[in-house]
Amino acid sequence: MRKFRLIPYKQVDKVSALSEVPMGVEIVEAPAVWKASAKGAGQIIGVIDTGCQVDHPDLAERIIGGVNLTTDYGGVETNFSDNNGHGTHVAGTVAAAETGSGVVGVAPKADLFIIKALSGDGSGEMGWIAKAIRYAVDWRGPKGEQMRIITMSLGGPTDSEELHDAVKYAVSNNVSVVCAAGNEGDGREDTNEFAYPAAYNEVIAVGAVDFDLRLSDFPNTNEEIDIVAPGVGIKSTYLDSGYAELSGTSMAAPHVAGALALIINLAKDAFKRTLSETEICAQLVRRATPIGFTAQDKGNGFLTLGLVERITGQFTEKGKK
């Protein structure tokens, strides 16, 4: 039976209280597009991970539901509490609410649906992950709401037809699948390290850089990397209503998931229609800044949400002269 695990990560620090917009949220320029994107309101992101502390003060108002697909808690589906910490951290980066204290996520008015597909020890069966993806796609809220985005900071070393089919099912139903690229890198650009599902072409695979936009030595490098985001020293929500600073591509991926919620709203306003998953990916690529590394390292570049508006503004000013 094939096992999938959390993408390995490093815990740097743990604190009981914070009050800030995390640096990662700032440098991807999320605040620059919050007004135009309604801070992600109306979008639902499925977080497939170790669960979540549902009563965390920064997350409680953003979590609209969840399910447990593991054998933890006796397999009770309604108990999707986090018994690891990883899932709570990921959820906070995606959409921690603006409460006046604590931290703020990339899309602070987007909603979260928690899918516990990893046990407290960070492992999960491949079937749980595939089922979680299909569950997210098929879920409907009381008013017909649907998830448009799935984020997964997990992976395994081997390809799986069942898992790949689940990913393709999601994308064919206009659900974007965001995955951490993996932390098995050797610091070299000319070697490939793959983790699945991030290695599937249909997935948005996310690598990691630090706050100075320097590549870390831990991320996987390969030709399937799509974009990079902050993944070193990321502060977010954690167990016991606290906060932690973690590092890894696990921390980079949720920046992109939150960004997609903002981009979907921006695109709908700009195009006056709902864009397909492929079109949304194209809009994401438009907001990637080249940072001087090979495509194996950084894909299309660094996530820069305010890039399009900044360029548009420059041309608008030129046109007025």
Curated annotation (Swiss-Prot):
Its EC number is 3.4.21.-. Residues 22-311 form the Peptidase S8 domain. Keywords: Hydrolase, Protease, Serine protease. Pfam families: Peptidase_S8. The keyword Protease applies. Belongs to the peptidase S8 family. It comes from the Bacteria. One of its GO terms (molecular function) is serine-type endopeptidase activity. It comes from Shouchella clausii. The lineage of its organism: Bacteria, Bacillati, Bacillota, Bacilli, Bacillales. Gene3D superfamilies: Peptidase S8/S53 domain. InterPro entries: Peptidase_S8/S53_dom, Peptidase_S8/S53_dom_sf, Peptidase_S8/S53_subtilisin, Peptidase_S8_Asp-AS, Peptidase_S8_His-AS, Peptidase_S8_Ser-AS, Peptidase_S8_subtilisin-rel, Subtilisin_Carlsberg-like. The active site is at residues 49, 86, 250. GO terms for biological process: proteolysis. This is Intracellular alkaline protease. The keyword 4Fe-4S does not apply.
